[in-house]
């Protein structure tokens, strides 16, 4: 176990030495962490609007992007007393997430395999190339990267509940499900069906073997109720995100059709390196799955398979194989109807995301195969093949990391100094809807040039008048306007639902997006006006908060009731103590 931890830390050495560096999404996480820390300093623990983003013109990113990763970064920043540069806060946080994912997969694998095998599988899970090299080092997709933490924990909690009927495992299941939905909604969407399939298969297998414990109906109802309530707790995040999805420039998410991301096509190391790399990973995983299935079937024909336990039956082995095969077909672009409108999986964006499932399933299959094949010769042969492949993947990643960091200076972080981070330019999907903005930052900055470093926080858009005074604090504006005619007043914040305006007499005024750049704009008549323009929570935020609170209360009640019922069953099942035994116990 210690050796596996050392290897994993070695793979994180570049991150810990250089900090978070250039990758696809890392700039966003710099920006979001900066904005989140600013919001916390203003007393907001879960902000939705980022008034300091987009060069101080505001962004709704926190309405849509899951909050867990950013909040975890902020926690790490607090633990280090705000002394670490943000690049190292993110790197240390990612390392902690990687270690946690390894530990949780180890716990999951221990249901089937030995300590040594489980430790190696935990290392392989944390250092799997899509997980580590792609999601952290190359893409910087830290929400998706963090989702790897929760997946084995969900399976482990569900499995232990099926084995022991212990309510504490249901509580852990609820926490992990809520965590996954707060971390990465797309990962929850693709992992959810696999979790459901495993639970149903294991539950019916337990019933056939006649295992003691609550009946199948009670067990299934308990797990479904807890899972649904756990999802409801996360409604605080995803209900506003889904409800307001069309209020931002979210069409930018689908500028590239999902069909164009299929693997096993247009392969070229030079012309299409990303798809080629993902295809290599997928091909290796599919080949290993086929090999493990062949070894299992060979042993089964010779009746050299250990008696099946929960999660180690032939049906379970087949299920893991089918899941990997289906993911392979999906990534190849087959069965494309699954990703066509109105399917929610249309929002997956990249078919390569299914590698999240494939890496987990393959390593789980390894643990199961080692559990059911007791012959030392077979185990040795399988271990040799797997170690050879995994060692090759580790070497591949080490070489890729060496190439990435070979000439990179430690003292200068190009991400932190980039104009995108300096001006906190958010991804295009969070631009104001309908604004004629370029997605490339080098084209966007000239468009925003008149407002980038402007001290002007409000101005007259239409009509005759002037702004006498402007006071602005974290997106809350107070203006004094003198108008000779009716005027339209714009503030230096982009429009998004939630802006409200009020004059000195307490009358509410409508806020619109009346300018080409979609700045929040208020119309007032002739005269002198004192206006307060600020954001207030949208009704959907209130509904989401109430649903989340109600779900949490019901979840605690359900867990409490199930715990009480379990203790009552245990007390009834306990044999009565004889008087002599009772006296001795006293």
Language-model segments: what does each one mean?
Residues 12-13, 38-39, 112, 121-122, ...:
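Generic detector of short, locally flexible boundary/turn motifs and exposed helical patches
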Residues 1-409, 529-535, 541-580, 584-586:
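Membrane-embedded transmembrane-helix bundle of lipid-linked glycan/lipid transferases
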Residues 40-41, 123-126, 325-327, 332-335, ...:
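A generic short-segment signal for beta-strand/edge and adjacent turn/coil regions
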Residues 403-468:
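Membrane-interface segments at or immediately adjacent to transmembrane helices
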Residues 34, 83, 184, 207, ...:
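Residue-identity detector for glutamine
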